Amino acid sequence: MWGLMFWLLPFLVLSAAPTALDASASSQPAARGFDLRWSRVATPKPGSPRAIGQPGAGCVQGAVALPLRGPGWTVVHPERHREFGHPDLLTYVRELASRARREKLGLLCVGDLGQPRGGPMPTGHRSHQIGLDIDLWYGPPAKPLTSGSTAMPPTMVDLRTGKLLSAWNDRVARLIEAAAASPAVDRIFVHPAIKRALCQDKGRAGPWLQRVRPWWGHHDHFHVRLRCPTGDTDCKEPQPLPAGPGCDASLDWWFSEDARATAAKRGPPGEGAPAMPEQCESVLEEEGQPKTKAP
């Protein structure tokens, strides 16, 4: 077992690197030649809400800012200016926060949504580009959140051993279940060890479990992705999820030598990303201003 953990350790550490809610994520550089124009826009593009493209290559028109504080939620890093999303995403946050209050699941600590007009971010994310993605902490930090706080999210996984820590408990599992139960959700990304724990809890099985997917990082937050809004033809639907709850050999792969090797090959955000949709150039334009070229 210790031999297994020895070679698994590099994979687990690399798994932590792409997260958006820890110190490494906030400084993780993007690929060379990255289009920085999207991160320089301060306001949403006016117009009817449109999610354009796909999570890793797209933009959003008519985005709305999530209030930094509301009934049952708080945005933990407002200085990042990433509290914008499609109106459907804000509705989802309000509904989940309301359920969390009713079921005593605690305050929703909200990480990144997206930029005012979506698009690629210079640090931390490959996706979050079309206003339908949001990061949520598994729970509040050990110290109370205050203005200008640099509090870190509690981690659920010991990255040296790959085992769940004492911070993992029934409340966290119920929060993930509540988050995945919404019909608006396409999928939720969690650390592979968390997915395995949910699979092993036979009393918690249900259709929602299929939407919870293992992915690199996500030891200190989970990533919710919504379905394309109804009637939004510019939004590209992701590949359908495999049938079943995902508690089979596909989950075992994440603890394999092949997974470790794959993690080592992962590049920075933006590397190998699909081309941006042509419609996004008009989303980036300001009224009365000439088109700008990517640097």
Model regions and ranges:
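Extracellular "leader-to-stem" segments immediately downstream of a signal peptide or signal-anchor
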Residues: 11, 20-64, 283, 287, ...
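Acidic/His-rich structured neighborhood in mature extracellular/periplasmic domains
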Residues: 115-165, 224
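Extracytoplasmic
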Residues: 103-105, 129-133, 219-221
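Bacterial N-terminal signal peptides
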Residues: 3-15
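Active-site acidic/histidine clusters and adjacent loop/turn architecture
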Residues: 39-111, 168-178, 182-185
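Extended, low-complexity, intrinsically disordered C-terminal regulatory tails
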Residues: 34-46, 92-124, 189-211
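Sterically constrained small-residue positions within well-ordered secondary structures
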Residues: 7-10, 101, 125-127, 215
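Catalytic cores and adjacent binding grooves of peptidoglycan-active enzymes
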Residues: 21-34, 146-295
